Amino acid sequence: MWTPQKSRWVNPKASVKPSPQEQLKFAQALYEQSKYNEAIDECRKLIKYYPKAFEASEAQFYMALSFEGEKKLYEAFQAYQKVIDKYPFSKRLDEIIEKELRIAQAFMAGEKRKIGKVELPVENPAIEILRKVVDNSAYGKSASYAQYLLGMTLKEAFRYQEAREEFEKVGTTYPESEWVSQAKFQAADCASKIAPKSDYDQELTKEAKKKFEEFVKSQPQAELKKEAVSKIDALKEKEAEGALKIAEFYEKQKKFEAARIYYQEIIDKCPYCLSATPARDKLKELEKK
């Protein structure tokens, strides 16, 4: 198309409307018609040609909406986050945080990052997105829930130490949150999962048991109490098994007094544990020596 003002041919597809208001309306109309890719292009034009206009933040928001309409969820998250980073005055901040949270939940539910139809072998994007939601929310209504979900996502990725740290933040940062009880339980569960398999190092097992006991004491009405008690019993069994093997080790080394102490500890601390029976038998044998 020939333009007398510029005295040259211009591709109509590359042209921009005379004002940011008109350009935004044009992009919004394309979005409403579900012409998402075209809407994205027009939003980009507005941001490029009118970067300081008030409408630039709305263009960025509609670009994110259009990516979401195209089911490009990670790109949508990135575009939403740009509104927060570049246009902190935007009236859309609370709305954007909720949209980012929803995108994170989609990835938690199994959505994958893709290029075209090809799934990318990358870390679950929910981890990155939830970290941003927590940062963006500060002490907002979604903050503690996002913090809890971050812990759950890390736990599902078998990153138990990181998950445990994030769960603990729910209680320390948002002590009045409805998610504190669940987070305490999950933190204890993560501690039990990272307890070493070695029977000679029981510190993390003891710590996990202590956390479950604290949970039961502080949340006596919690729905998870029954499961927590079951996990305490399992950890007691594990602790007793470890003590039994340590006692047997000392006995083989002919350090009978040390062995006696560990056998007695099993009987005193967990008299109904499976390891208690052999511990009693061993003590009787040691009495004869």
Descriptions of predicted regions:
Residues 1-289:
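Acidic, polar-rich low-complexity tracts and alpha-helical solenoid repeat scaffolds
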